[in-house]
């Protein structure tokens, strides 16, 4: 276990932000009786709840380990961050898949690709052999993200538009939030401690991750749950071509 330094302030901000997001989504969904809407509320509430636990672990040092990289030099690995992403990014993908009415086979592919993306980043951050091997793992992770980009811009966007024009508009909004913010993660990673270059300070790196996480988890969820028409469309009898029927 390592003790966070000045970055602890941002880790606590992340913890509080995720707790507030969890409470907000839970209160919003409390009165919902529609099964499809409940599914959205449960998934969307779980996302910041998991992130809150991860940020609490990092803020208290439980989610951080110190690893030697060169001689006596050590680097702090925030493993709880990757545990968070490994659990929450598939939930975000499931939310998108529900809105789009994606096929089960497609959803399974996306979850596997997503896991490769996250684990590639974790593997790179733990490598001690130098910058080259870290960049290789960064490239693996980034390639997986590009494949996700292909599916979200292609098949899922088409399926969302086929459900209704409004569903297509809301899906595009959610997709753009997700992809736009996710595209910034590998940049922060390669410039920070993950890539081993340390171009940006640890505190700045943590701050950027907190801001990105709040946007992708709470911002995404707020936009989704404000789109009540899409939640209703998902439970419409004519929308049977979704992930529950394939």
Curated annotation (Swiss-Prot):
Record-level GO BP terms: phototransduction
Annotated transmembrane regions: 7-27, 45-65, 82-102, 107-127, 135-155, 182-202, 205-225
Subcellular location field: Cell membrane
SUPFAM superfamilies xref list: Family A G protein-coupled receptor-like
Annotated site residue numbers, Primary proton acceptor: 84
Entry-linked SMART domains: Bac_rhodopsin
Protein name listed in UniProt: Bacteriorhodopsin-II-like protein
Organism: Haloquadratum walsbyi (strain DSM 16790 / HBSQ001)
Gene name linked to the record: bop2
